[in-house]
Each structure stands twice: as structure tokens, then as C-alpha cells.
């Protein structure tokens, strides 16, 4: 029996005979109602009313004889007035809630969600502010804008002897004063800058010319800072350092080195040398590319003048 789904409750002993076929049931219904009772176009008081479509009984089978949606009842599309059908319009109230929502203006959306444009000038300025230096096996960022006034603290003084034996000039007079509100931040970035620059300047052996003149106590780096610099220097750089020349050594720096001598290796202590004027420095180092600040030259003239006065009196 096609098109009929039998359920368990139907298979009962109360049904002594088999259920009738679907075709006989449909024929009985048509005989009772008659074809004139089928829905069609009606006229009331001579006025044509809209035709109402009766929903057919939908069967879950695909058999055309069951009155499913595939039956011939819906094939009579020619008798239906499509213009007269009451269909929902495009502006139906079903979606009116969307229109009631406040719609922000395009400019407002752009203003709230937009990101400030990064101009080429700002990108260039940001690139100048931050610079990467490699110290040992790690890369460190240095705030170049913060240390801009103090970058002259380290410079390249040319070469000496044969080969690429570099002369590195360290001018303490360009150090920041300890009274600066951001002194620790400055010294931290300056430390990275000095060590990173030293890595770039040195290829083989090198010497450091430490210009100590014209330096107040406020600009003197602490012992911990100097020790940190020495400890952070790569082993290759510590080994290749041939000489540390201190020009115009003050009583403070000489006392400091004397106190720390027991904690410094004997090899490093042998590399330290004091020079009391620029003329003596010129005998040890080629001065062609060594940049001497004006304040150092002025201090040197004052010190040499005081030393020459007793000789002139004699």
C-alpha cells in the first residue's frame, strides 16, 4: 500500500479487514461534496472580491495522488489573479524596527573609530628617536631623543699604530647632572648608547681617552655605573682594550681608582695611565681626529698657566 505510513497503534485486532486504499477515500469525498463546492471565484452583490486560497492538505509523501504540494490543485495558476493577492509589501511592519534604530552618520563613525594618520614626518621622527643597539647577544632600544644633548659623551678619535686600532674619546663633561628629574632614565639609555657605540667603533685593539677635566661632581658618573659599563662590555672588548688614558685626573677620580684597585684585575690596573695636560696626551696619541671640547681646552690652559707661573718667577 503506497503513500500510507502505518503506525504501530493501527495494527490492532479491532480492524478485521484491511484499511481502504487512498483512491477510494478520495472518490468518496468528491462524491459527497461535489465539484461545485470546490473553492473558486465568488461574487457578492455583483462585486468581485479577492479570492482566498485554501491551503491544501500537505502530505509527507511525494505521491501526486495524495493531495501534496505537487498535486494538480496548484497547477491551475491561470485562474488566480496574482495582482489581487494580498501579499506583504516591501515596507512591511515586520522590518520596521530596523528603520527605527538610530543610524550614526558616516562622519561620526569615522571620527570615533578612526586611527590618527601616521605621517611620513612622524614616522621619520619616530625612527630617529628609537635606535637598536646590540650588546652581547641581545638587542636594546635606546631613546635617542632623550640622550640627544649627551651623545657627545663618546666619539671616535681616529686610529693609532698599524691596523684598525681605534681611539675612543669619552668626555665626562657632556654627562647629565645628577639633579635631573629623569636622571636614572637618562643614564640607563646613555649606558646602552655608550656600550652599543663601542661595539660599533671597535674592530681590533683600541684605547680609551677619558677626558675628566671641566667636570663638576654632579656630572661625575657613579662608581656603580662605571662598574656596570665594564661588566657589560663584551669579553672581546675587555681583552682588546690596550690602554685607558685619564686626562686631567681630579683628586676624586684618583682616590676612587685607588680604593677600587683591590677589586680590579691586575691586568686592567696596568692599562690605566694618568695624563695631566693635552701636550702630554699628544705625545701618546695622534690628535688629528681627537675631538677636544672647548671647556677642556680652557681648563688645560688654566692648569698650564698655573704651572708656568713658578717657572717664570724663578
From Swiss-Prot:
Record-level Gene Ontology MF annotations: calcium ion binding; GTPase activator activity
KW Lipid metabolism (keyword) present: no
This protein's GO CC annotations: centriole; cytoplasm; cytosol; intracellular membrane-bounded organelle; nuclear envelope; nucleolus; perinuclear region of cytoplasm; spindle pole centrosome
SMART domains: SEC14
Organism this protein belongs to: Homo sapiens (Human)
Keyword tags: Apoptosis, Cytoplasm, Phosphoprotein
Region listing for Disordered, in residue ranges: 1-21, 76-100
Phosphothreonine found at: 87
Keyword match Phosphoprotein: yes
Compositional bias annotation for Acidic residues: 10-21
Modified residues (Phosphoserine): 41, 77, 89, 92, 114
Function: Implicated in the suppression of cell death. Interacts with the BCL-2 and adenovirus E1B 19 kDa proteins.
Name of a matching Pfam family: BNIP2
The protein, known as: BCL2/adenovirus E1B 19 kDa protein-interacting protein 2
